[in-house]
């Protein structure tokens, strides 16, 4: 229990990616470039899937929302992180910290579910191509995406409420570059068993549950591809899901390393911070590249968009 006489924490201090003063400006420039590329890439995907009529399919509808989620996830983290590289006292208020944690949880949970939906979409497209447009209808897509955001929001509210229901009255130094569950609970001066349990169950349920959907979908996809007689047909079928397979492997590998571990009262180590950098900033930057460079439809749509844009400027 928390002691009777204490001063309640009103602000937190973030240690950041590195405490070395000489690295602050170089790190600022590196992460500024990362965030800039993330913004450009994901906004590009959102724009292309919105304006190009050939990309108005369920596959690209889900990709559009994945790009939106990636954009939101990095925006919750990056701006504050960049500011902290330039200031000596890296403080964040209690409510600002709670808002950042809630926003991060909303987007990361939504991304986990969205990747599972995209795997199911690829499963139907390859295993049941004749029924694809009937099964994965526009109405169903809207419903699934809406439920994804609703579930992400509900999870964020519940988990962040439990994390901030405990007392913070001793140290206020968060060993991280943003407000996250594990380093926050390590600072609490009250019993953290319940919030730690909620965090662990939520993370394990979301990651393992969605991972099962992904694995089952791709197991059936592989079986269907192996049944295709021609090598050209197998190559074409594989190419439709290769980008998503790569994105899923990178994302789940990093997330499993980070979150599916026994409860601990210890704050994050350097490896955990690097994993956090990877899935909050690097993966949102990589996804547009993965889905565009390995996708003929997206590359063709980009060429059409740039051609039309250049033509519009010439006729002005």
Swiss-Prot record:
Which residue positions carry a glycan here? 5
- Gene Ontology cellular-component terms listed: plasma membrane
Coarse class of the protein's main subcellular location: membrane
Q: Name one GO molecular function term.
A: G protein-coupled receptor activity
Which of the residues are on side Extracellular?
1-25, 76-99, 161-197, 259-272
Q: Which domain of life is it from?
A: Eukaryota
Q: What does this protein do?
A: Odorant receptor.
Q: What is this protein called?
A: Olfactory receptor 8J1
Gene name per UniProt: OR8J1
